[in-house]
Amino acid sequence: YLHQNKESDKQEKKPKILQMRELIEMDLPPDRPLLRPWLPEDGIVLLHAKAGAGKTFFAMAAAYAVATGGSFLGWEATEPAGVLYCDAELPIKVLQERLKQLTTVNENHCPDNFHLLSSDFQDLGIPSIDSAEGFRFIEEAIRPGVRLLVLDNLSTLLRNGVENEAQSWQPTQDWLLRLRRKGITTMVVHHSGKSGDQRGTSKRLDVVNTVLNLSLQDSEDENKTVITLNFSKHRGFFGEDAASRRITMQDGIWSWTKEAQNNREIVKQFLKEGMKQSEISRELGFSRQYISKLVKQMKNDEVAIEGNEFYVDSEK
């Protein structure tokens, strides 16, 4: 489906130069984000989390919203778009159960444009995606209309080379960029390392549009998963759109609040207890500037701290 013949490959190697005015005046189609704002058209996204933090559940739910043209955690799809979900970790029965849970909370709707490539369903698995064989295998599975490819996950799909070496990542990066030029957005699902960052070479971050990190939080309800989502890279969107979120999942149903709202409540309580902003900063591990910003927001919103008076310490 995506392969080019040798003649066109030779033509593509010739440089194509544009003048500034020519590019500015070029009539390009309007942008159609797959999920606004973090899952762009013709982009690359990295989603990483430690084991048990819900990264596959999250990726599947986001992909389902793309396929149906719906929404997920307040992020809206522009229109329905085809999806190829490539899973190289889960046994086929577990994959089936997760998809059943996903569709059960969506009136059992199974969109025809949501395609699955399961390693467990292949005779010889899925070839490593740093090889021509692996690239060709996945490209042959991409059907017309597919605009989102989900690779879940990098550790099981990328098996050659050294994870921490930038050079080992280069062939895969070149392939992802080639898919991008052909109108395919890729969501790469990966594991977090001990530090909380994505595991392996930082070169993976160079060309991606968005990096999302899911962190599992303590929950009093064993049937409820509580996650903090952070955008550590957010090309093209800022401010409130890039704010951290506190996400909960229970029985396949997702809900969320902005993490800043929870932080405000914590800061408010500390202020009530008479703590100074510098003390709160040290206690929470946030910068003084961030704590000051939250205090200013509460002051503007006329949040009462001490009786009817808003408490602001005298520290500069």
List each language-model region with its residue ranges.
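Amphipathic coiled-coil/heptad-repeat helices and related helical stalk/stem segments
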Residues: D31-R32, G134, P171-T172, D197, ...
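Phosphate-binding/switch region of NTP-binding enzymes
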Residues: L46-L47, G52, F57, L148, ...
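The Walker A/P-loop phosphate-binding site
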Residues: D9-T103, N108-H109, S202
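Conserved inter-motif catalytic segment of the P-loop NTP-binding fold
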Residues: L35, A51, T78-V162, T257-Q261
